[in-house]
Amino acid sequence: MEIRVANKYALGKKLGSGSFGDIYVAKDIVTMEEFAVKLESTRSKHPQLLYESKLYKILGGGIGVPKVYWYGIEGDFTIMVLDLLGPSLEDLFTLCNRKFSLKTVLMTADQMLNRIEYVHSKNFIHRDIKPDNFLIGRGKKVTLIHIIDFGLAKKYRDSRSHTHIPYKEGKNLTGTARYASINTHLGIEQSRRDDIEALGYVLMYFLRGSLPWQGLKAISKKDKYDKIMEKKISTSVEVLCRNTSFEFVTYLNYCRSLRFEDRPDYTYLRRLLKDLFIREGFTYDFLFDWTCVYASEKDKKKMLENKNRFDQIADQEGRVKQN
């Protein structure tokens, strides 16, 4: 039986699950256009879909921000219909054998910085910068990196007065420990600097293949967070960025030098990485490491579909001849 949302979208296959609920593909029953549908139980102890839908509305119109087409409650579920995107940078990283070239990292960093700056310009911080929350588009937007998942985002300043939230300590870790800034580990209220520092760790993860604080054995979540923090603090920026360009050392040192209310100089950081891009003689051609691999995976799928279709036709023709 076909399940419909808002009497307009036919629910298809499940794409994934999260702490909030499930994500499905859906088709507009008239245009047959595909969308992503997020479902959250109305009995959820920590509902976040309403909050996230409001965030998408505030961020609406931004480059690389998914558009929300419908939000509401049907039956036992809170539902949000939004743009269907391609795989995440984490998925593509795995597809590329868990290592990105310097060229891909720099082209990716440029777009990711733009997305983070845009979110900040709308008075919010993301608080969960990680490869899983950056997705490529589909079709004509396959080279455009999108930022998603605003369930943990927080307003860091007043929309009108631009008064910054106060400095606080003793906060629990919000986000993903692997990429969290040192100040976040120390329990300090997050601000713009923390999103930028987290991006620095994402870039090193892409370049190195892993981070020194991955795979630490722990007896509890708190113990794991503590061990990650200890390793992160004890690993100097120079050691972390060993065998990479000095620009990454400069990037992370800059992030760590920012004060709580400081506005990061996004232009300076982009220029820093663009200068490295130019010095290496790269061309900004939007050909990422995954471009050929991802395309060939899709081609393989199409070939398999065509082969199956051909086999079916041949089978039918065979039956006709036998009859």
Swiss-Prot record:
Cofactors that this protein relies on: Mg(2+)
SMART domains recorded: S_TKc (SM00220)
Catalytic activity of the protein: L-seryl-[protein] + ATP = O-phospho-L-seryl-[protein] + ADP + H(+); L-threonyl-[protein] + ATP = O-phospho-L-threonyl-[protein] + ADP + H(+)
EC number: 2.7.11.1
Residues binding ATP, per UniProt: 15-23, 38
InterPro entries: CK1_Ser-Thr_kinase, Kinase-like_dom_sf, Prot_kinase_dom, Protein_kinase_ATP_BS, Ser/Thr_kinase_AS
Task performed by this protein: Serine/threonine-protein kinase likely to be involved in many cellular processes.
One term of GO molecular function: ATP binding
Disulfide bonds: none
Keyword vocabulary terms for this entry: ATP-binding, Cytoplasm, Cytoplasmic vesicle, Kinase, Magnesium, Metal-binding, Nucleotide-binding, Secreted, Serine/threonine-protein kinase, Transferase
Active site: 128 (proton acceptor)
UniProt record similarity statement: Belongs to the protein kinase superfamily. CK1 Ser/Thr protein kinase family. Casein kinase I subfamily.
Primary enzyme class: transferase
Annotated ranges, domain Protein kinase: 9-278
Subcellular location, record wording: Cytoplasm; Cytoplasmic vesicle, Secretory vesicle, Microneme; Secreted; Host cell surface
GO cellular component: cytoplasmic vesicle; extracellular region; host cell surface; microneme
Protein name, as recorded: Casein kinase I
Primary localisation category: cytoplasm
